[in-house]
Amino acid sequence: PVEIIIVGALKVGIKDTDIIRINVYFAGGINFEEGIWFDASIVDSEIVGIKLEGDMAFRLFWGGNTKGFLLSIGGFHPNYTPEEGMLVSDMKRMALKLDYKVLKVGLEAYLAVTSNSFQIGAHLDICVGWNKFGIRGYAGFDALFQFDPFLFMFSIEAGVSVVCGSWKLLSIDLG
């Protein structure tokens, strides 16, 4: 069997500034008898002060022991395990992070489509304040739709709290 593999890096930026700095490392290959695979990771990247990171995977297998399709940007639903033959390891969520002294915002998300499922989810964390005092909030959801056997799962969570030192003065959690 003939297999072609490509490995590389993509770097995007504006010289002498940190306005845009994107680093993507990737590897992919094709085995003409079995299928195509491609993986990419965004690392040490930033756009206008917003940090970026995350993983992506693509698989299309038509021969060999595993047959099927998989596209994931940021991983999978927490209750989903890809087929062993798809050769997908732990993936980092696609993430945007803003980190200032008084404001911290983090958004993590994933989207996955496989031969047998559709998955989407996101989680948002916000902190306004200082180390010892502030308001913290979060919200998130996860959805999994599987065709065979039929399965639909959806969960949602949200909460907010006021903290002072190591004490939670007030909190509301849903989910």
Predicted regions and their residues:
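Extended assembly/interaction regions that build large supramolecular complexes
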Residues: P1-G175
